[in-house]
UniProtKB/Swiss-Prot annotation:
Pathway: Cofactor biosynthesis; (R)-pantothenate biosynthesis; (R)-pantothenate from (R)-pantoate and beta-alanine: step 1/1. This is Pantoate--beta-alanine ligase. The gene is PANC. InterPro entries: Pantoate_ligase (IPR003721), Pantoate_ligase_C (IPR042176), Rossmann-like_a/b/a_fold (IPR014729). It holds the Pfam family Pantoate_ligase. Belongs to the pantothenate synthetase family. It catalyses: (R)-pantoate + beta-alanine + ATP = (R)-pantothenate + AMP + diphosphate + H(+). One of its GO terms (molecular function) is pantoate-beta-alanine ligase activity. Homodimer. SUPFAM superfamilies: Nucleotidylyl transferase.
Length: 308
Protein backbone atom coordinates (compact mmCIF):
# COMPACT_ATOMS: atom_id res chain seq x y z
CA UNK A 1 0.00 0.00 0.00
CA UNK A 2 1.27 3.47 -0.87
CA UNK A 3 2.43 5.51 2.14
CA UNK A 4 0.72 8.70 3.19
CA UNK A 5 2.58 11.71 1.76
CA UNK A 6 2.63 14.89 3.83
CA UNK A 7 4.18 18.16 2.69
CA UNK A 8 2.90 20.57 5.34
CA UNK A 9 4.86 20.97 8.58
CA UNK A 10 1.81 21.41 10.80
CA UNK A 11 0.10 18.39 9.27
CA UNK A 12 3.24 16.30 9.84
CA UNK A 13 3.38 17.38 13.47
CA UNK A 14 -0.32 16.65 13.92
CA UNK A 15 0.09 13.11 12.52
CA UNK A 16 3.07 12.35 14.77
CA UNK A 17 1.39 13.64 17.91
CA UNK A 18 -1.74 11.66 17.12
CA UNK A 19 0.26 8.45 16.72
CA UNK A 20 2.30 9.04 19.86
CA UNK A 21 -0.87 9.76 21.86
CA UNK A 22 -1.87 6.20 20.97
CA UNK A 23 1.37 4.89 22.45
CA UNK A 24 3.12 4.34 19.11
CA UNK A 25 6.88 4.72 18.73
CA UNK A 26 7.96 6.57 15.57
CA UNK A 27 11.26 6.07 13.73
CA UNK A 28 12.49 8.70 11.28
CA UNK A 29 14.77 7.99 8.32
CA UNK A 30 15.96 11.33 6.91
CA UNK A 31 16.93 11.24 3.21
CA UNK A 32 17.44 13.55 0.25
CA UNK A 33 15.66 11.14 -2.06
CA UNK A 34 16.91 9.23 -5.12
CA UNK A 35 16.78 6.18 -2.90
CA UNK A 36 18.90 3.06 -3.29
CA UNK A 37 19.33 -0.16 -1.35
CA UNK A 38 21.37 1.63 1.30
CA UNK A 39 18.40 3.84 2.14
CA UNK A 40 16.03 0.88 2.13
CA UNK A 41 18.26 -0.91 4.62
CA UNK A 42 17.79 2.07 6.96
CA UNK A 43 14.02 1.64 6.65
CA UNK A 44 14.33 -2.05 7.51
CA UNK A 45 16.45 -1.15 10.55
CA UNK A 46 13.86 1.43 11.56
CA UNK A 47 11.18 -1.27 11.69
CA UNK A 48 13.27 -3.06 14.32
CA UNK A 49 13.14 -0.08 16.68
CA UNK A 50 9.65 1.43 16.35
CA UNK A 51 5.99 0.77 15.57
CA UNK A 52 5.78 3.29 12.75
CA UNK A 53 8.32 4.48 10.18
CA UNK A 54 8.49 7.97 8.70
CA UNK A 55 10.83 8.80 5.82
CA UNK A 56 11.67 12.39 4.95
CA UNK A 57 12.60 13.24 1.37
CA UNK A 58 14.03 16.73 1.08
CA UNK A 59 17.07 18.01 -0.81
CA UNK A 60 18.49 20.37 1.77
CA UNK A 61 19.84 23.61 0.25
CA UNK A 62 21.47 24.50 3.55
CA UNK A 63 24.25 21.95 3.07
CA UNK A 64 25.23 23.12 -0.42
CA UNK A 65 27.79 25.87 -1.03
CA UNK A 66 27.53 28.37 -3.92
CA UNK A 67 30.07 26.29 -5.89
CA UNK A 68 27.98 23.11 -5.62
CA UNK A 69 25.12 22.56 -8.06
CA UNK A 70 22.05 22.03 -5.92
CA UNK A 71 19.79 21.82 -8.98
CA UNK A 72 21.83 18.93 -10.39
CA UNK A 73 21.17 16.65 -7.42
CA UNK A 74 19.30 13.61 -8.79
CA UNK A 75 15.66 13.07 -7.88
CA UNK A 76 12.89 10.58 -8.66
CA UNK A 77 10.09 11.00 -6.15
CA UNK A 78 7.65 8.54 -7.73
CA UNK A 79 10.43 5.99 -8.05
CA UNK A 80 11.30 6.57 -4.39
CA UNK A 81 7.72 5.81 -3.35
CA UNK A 82 7.76 2.56 -5.32
CA UNK A 83 11.01 1.50 -3.66
CA UNK A 84 9.67 2.29 -0.19
CA UNK A 85 6.59 0.19 -0.92
CA UNK A 86 8.87 -2.75 -1.75
CA UNK A 87 10.29 -2.88 1.79
CA UNK A 88 8.53 -5.44 4.02
CA UNK A 89 6.21 -3.40 6.20
CA UNK A 90 6.66 -0.41 3.91
CA UNK A 91 6.61 3.03 5.49
CA UNK A 92 3.74 4.74 7.23
CA UNK A 93 4.35 8.29 6.11
CA UNK A 94 6.64 10.20 3.75
CA UNK A 95 7.37 13.79 4.72
CA UNK A 96 8.09 15.62 1.46
CA UNK A 97 8.13 19.37 2.14
CA UNK A 98 8.59 21.89 -0.63
CA UNK A 99 10.91 24.23 1.23
CA UNK A 100 11.86 24.19 4.89
CA UNK A 101 13.78 27.47 4.63
CA UNK A 102 11.11 29.67 3.02
CA UNK A 103 10.29 32.29 5.64
CA UNK A 104 9.61 35.19 3.29
CA UNK A 105 6.44 37.04 4.20
CA UNK A 106 5.40 37.21 0.55
CA UNK A 107 6.05 33.55 -0.23
CA UNK A 108 9.25 34.23 -2.15
CA UNK A 109 11.66 31.42 -2.88
CA UNK A 110 14.60 30.81 -0.59
CA UNK A 111 17.95 30.94 -2.35
CA UNK A 112 21.48 30.12 -1.30
CA UNK A 113 23.88 33.04 -1.17
CA UNK A 114 27.37 33.52 0.18
CA UNK A 115 27.56 35.52 3.40
CA UNK A 116 30.40 37.73 4.54
CA UNK A 117 31.96 34.91 6.51
CA UNK A 118 32.23 32.81 3.37
CA UNK A 119 29.48 30.39 4.33
CA UNK A 120 26.09 29.75 2.83
CA UNK A 121 22.93 31.25 4.26
CA UNK A 122 19.40 30.78 3.00
CA UNK A 123 17.77 34.14 2.40
CA UNK A 124 14.64 35.26 0.70
CA UNK A 125 15.34 37.02 -2.55
CA UNK A 126 12.29 39.28 -2.43
CA UNK A 127 11.65 40.34 1.12
CA UNK A 128 14.94 39.72 2.88
CA UNK A 129 13.34 37.57 5.56
CA UNK A 130 15.46 34.46 5.68
CA UNK A 131 16.96 31.69 7.74
CA UNK A 132 19.83 32.82 9.94
CA UNK A 133 19.81 30.37 12.86
CA UNK A 134 22.20 27.45 12.51
CA UNK A 135 23.16 24.41 14.58
CA UNK A 136 26.85 23.52 14.68
CA UNK A 137 29.03 20.87 16.26
CA UNK A 138 32.05 23.12 16.59
CA UNK A 139 34.79 20.48 16.76
CA UNK A 140 33.30 17.44 15.04
CA UNK A 141 32.36 19.40 11.89
CA UNK A 142 35.91 20.58 11.14
CA UNK A 143 37.95 17.46 10.18
CA UNK A 144 37.47 15.07 7.26
CA UNK A 145 34.64 16.29 4.98
CA UNK A 146 34.49 19.57 6.88
CA UNK A 147 37.82 20.68 5.44
CA UNK A 148 36.61 20.82 1.84
CA UNK A 149 32.91 21.40 2.61
CA UNK A 150 32.92 23.99 5.42
CA UNK A 151 29.16 24.64 5.35
CA UNK A 152 28.02 21.06 4.91
CA UNK A 153 27.64 19.86 8.49
CA UNK A 154 26.15 23.13 9.67
CA UNK A 155 23.46 22.57 7.07
CA UNK A 156 23.03 18.92 8.04
CA UNK A 157 22.77 19.59 11.78
CA UNK A 158 20.29 22.40 11.20
CA UNK A 159 17.98 20.49 8.87
CA UNK A 160 18.02 17.42 11.12
CA UNK A 161 17.12 19.63 14.07
CA UNK A 162 14.22 21.04 12.06
CA UNK A 163 13.09 17.53 11.09
CA UNK A 164 13.29 16.39 14.70
CA UNK A 165 11.15 19.35 15.75
CA UNK A 166 8.59 18.72 13.00
CA UNK A 167 8.34 14.91 12.97
CA UNK A 168 9.05 14.47 16.69
CA UNK A 169 10.39 10.90 16.35
CA UNK A 170 11.43 8.57 19.13
CA UNK A 171 14.15 7.00 16.99
CA UNK A 172 16.24 8.27 14.07
CA UNK A 173 18.26 6.03 11.76
CA UNK A 174 21.39 7.18 9.90
CA UNK A 175 23.83 5.29 7.70
CA UNK A 176 27.39 4.88 8.94
CA UNK A 177 28.71 5.43 5.43
CA UNK A 178 28.37 9.10 6.35
CA UNK A 179 30.36 8.43 9.51
CA UNK A 180 31.12 12.02 10.43
CA UNK A 181 27.48 12.99 9.94
CA UNK A 182 26.36 10.13 12.20
CA UNK A 183 28.76 11.22 14.95
CA UNK A 184 27.67 14.85 14.67
CA UNK A 185 24.00 13.90 14.99
CA UNK A 186 24.79 11.71 17.99
CA UNK A 187 26.61 14.60 19.65
CA UNK A 188 23.88 17.09 18.76
CA UNK A 189 21.18 14.87 20.28
CA UNK A 190 23.22 14.53 23.47
CA UNK A 191 24.18 18.20 23.77
CA UNK A 192 20.72 19.59 22.98
CA UNK A 193 18.84 17.03 25.09
CA UNK A 194 16.70 15.55 22.35
CA UNK A 195 14.79 12.55 23.66
CA UNK A 196 15.64 10.58 20.53
CA UNK A 197 17.59 7.35 20.10
CA UNK A 198 20.07 7.62 17.20
CA UNK A 199 20.77 4.35 15.38
CA UNK A 200 23.84 3.87 13.16
CA UNK A 201 23.22 1.43 10.31
CA UNK A 202 26.14 -0.41 8.71
CA UNK A 203 27.48 0.54 5.27
CA UNK A 204 25.60 -1.19 2.45
CA UNK A 205 27.75 -2.14 -0.52
CA UNK A 206 27.34 -3.17 -4.13
CA UNK A 207 28.32 -6.73 -5.07
CA UNK A 208 31.88 -5.58 -5.80
CA UNK A 209 32.11 -3.75 -2.48
CA UNK A 210 31.61 -0.15 -3.59
CA UNK A 211 29.64 1.76 -0.96
CA UNK A 212 26.14 2.54 -2.22
CA UNK A 213 25.59 6.23 -2.86
CA UNK A 214 23.22 8.42 -4.85
CA UNK A 215 26.34 9.98 -6.36
CA UNK A 216 27.42 6.72 -7.98
CA UNK A 217 25.17 7.63 -10.93
CA UNK A 218 27.72 10.32 -11.86
CA UNK A 219 30.35 7.65 -12.57
CA UNK A 220 31.06 6.55 -16.13
CA UNK A 221 31.37 2.77 -16.62
CA UNK A 222 35.16 3.11 -16.62
CA UNK A 223 35.17 5.29 -13.51
CA UNK A 224 32.75 2.93 -11.80
CA UNK A 225 35.18 0.06 -12.35
CA UNK A 226 38.11 2.04 -10.97
CA UNK A 227 36.20 3.37 -7.96
CA UNK A 228 36.27 -0.03 -6.25
CA UNK A 229 39.90 0.75 -5.44
CA UNK A 230 38.48 2.73 -2.50
CA UNK A 231 36.75 -0.15 -0.74
CA UNK A 232 39.35 -2.74 -1.74
CA UNK A 233 42.20 -0.68 -0.32
CA UNK A 234 40.28 0.04 2.88
CA UNK A 235 39.67 -3.66 3.49
CA UNK A 236 43.35 -4.39 2.78
CA UNK A 237 44.34 -1.73 5.30
CA UNK A 238 42.05 -3.25 7.92
CA UNK A 239 43.56 -6.70 7.32
CA UNK A 240 47.07 -5.25 7.61
CA UNK A 241 46.14 -3.60 10.92
CA UNK A 242 44.71 -6.84 12.25
CA UNK A 243 47.96 -8.54 11.24
CA UNK A 244 49.97 -6.09 13.33
CA UNK A 245 50.61 -3.04 11.13
CA UNK A 246 49.30 -0.32 13.44
CA UNK A 247 51.36 2.63 12.16
CA UNK A 248 48.73 4.84 10.57
CA UNK A 249 50.99 6.60 8.08
CA UNK A 250 51.91 3.29 6.45
CA UNK A 251 48.28 2.22 6.20
CA UNK A 252 47.27 5.58 4.76
CA UNK A 253 50.05 5.42 2.16
CA UNK A 254 48.79 2.00 1.10
CA UNK A 255 45.28 3.33 0.49
CA UNK A 256 46.36 6.57 -1.17
CA UNK A 257 48.67 4.74 -3.56
CA UNK A 258 45.99 2.24 -4.55
CA UNK A 259 43.35 4.89 -5.25
CA UNK A 260 45.76 7.21 -7.05
CA UNK A 261 47.05 4.43 -9.28
CA UNK A 262 43.45 3.65 -10.22
CA UNK A 263 42.96 7.22 -11.39
CA UNK A 264 41.29 8.68 -8.32
CA UNK A 265 42.03 12.08 -6.81
CA UNK A 266 42.31 12.02 -3.03
CA UNK A 267 40.36 14.55 -1.00
CA UNK A 268 41.42 13.01 2.29
CA UNK A 269 42.51 9.68 3.76
CA UNK A 270 42.71 9.68 7.55
CA UNK A 271 42.57 7.30 10.48
CA UNK A 272 40.72 8.87 13.39
CA UNK A 273 39.34 8.00 16.80
CA UNK A 274 35.80 6.62 16.48
CA UNK A 275 34.41 8.98 19.12
CA UNK A 276 36.05 12.38 18.68
CA UNK A 277 37.28 11.97 15.07
CA UNK A 278 40.76 13.17 16.03
CA UNK A 279 43.72 11.84 14.05
CA UNK A 280 45.76 9.06 15.58
CA UNK A 281 49.34 8.09 14.78
CA UNK A 282 49.16 4.51 16.06
CA UNK A 283 46.12 2.27 16.32
CA UNK A 284 45.70 1.57 20.02
CA UNK A 285 41.91 1.48 20.27
CA UNK A 286 38.75 1.76 18.17
CA UNK A 287 39.43 3.85 15.05
CA UNK A 288 37.78 4.46 11.73
CA UNK A 289 39.65 4.81 8.43
CA UNK A 290 37.84 7.48 6.41
CA UNK A 291 38.44 8.23 2.73
CA UNK A 292 37.10 10.75 0.26
CA UNK A 293 38.19 10.61 -3.38
CA UNK A 294 37.11 11.96 -6.73
CA UNK A 295 36.55 9.80 -9.76
CA UNK A 296 35.52 12.06 -12.61
CA UNK A 297 32.69 14.30 -11.40
CA UNK A 298 31.81 12.07 -8.45
CA UNK A 299 33.14 12.74 -4.98
CA UNK A 300 32.87 9.43 -3.14
CA UNK A 301 33.27 8.72 0.56
CA UNK A 302 33.78 5.45 2.40
CA UNK A 303 35.09 4.21 5.71
CA UNK A 304 35.88 1.10 7.66
CA UNK A 305 35.97 0.63 11.42
CA UNK A 306 39.04 -1.04 12.92
CA UNK A 307 38.57 -2.41 16.43
CA UNK A 308 41.78 -3.83 17.85
Amino acid sequence: MAPMVISDKDEMRKWSRSMRSQGKLIALVPTMGFLHEGHLSLVRDAHNHADLVAVSIYVNPGQFSPTEDLSAYPSDFQGDLQKLMSVPGGVDVVFHPHNLYDYGGDGGDAVAECGGDGVVSCVDRRSGFGHETWVRAEKLEKPLCGKSRPVFFRGVATIVTKLFNIVEPDVAVFGKKDYQQWKIIQRMVRDLDFSIKVIGSEVIREKDGLAMSSRNVYLSPEEREKAVSINKSLFRAKSAAEDGQIHCEKLINLVVQSITEAGGRIDYAEIVDQNNLEKVEWIKGPVVFCVSAWFGKARLIDNIEINL
